[in-house]
Amino acid sequence: MLQRLLVLRQHKERRLRQQLAHLRQAYQQREQQLADCRRERQQLCQQLQKLAQWRGNLLPAQASAQRERQHELYQAERQRQKQIGEWVALGQQQLAAIEAQQLLLRCNQREQEKLGMLINHESNRY
């Protein structure tokens, strides 16, 4: 009976480790997406800054086109900023899930140790 419980706990450990690996991989992918999004936002901010520097030196027709371009860049930058906030929130959720998974794994390992000691104790009794 105890041996069967130990085998079940070992299967559970394998499953928990696989899930933990998947969670960590998803977290790393999201971290990369966050870095990419931040880089894109930085590039958009630089483009906006360059457009703002030229603003007073343009003819009215050029200034109108520049305002449209500046508005498009601003909208894209705001979208990236929103996406960054979403990626950060998701990252916090993923970290919490990883920590919870690690806790489950540690608890399962303790249970396996207890079962192992009980099995040893039981076999030593006879």
Language-model segment annotations:
Residues 1-126:
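Charge-rich amphipathic alpha-helical interaction elements
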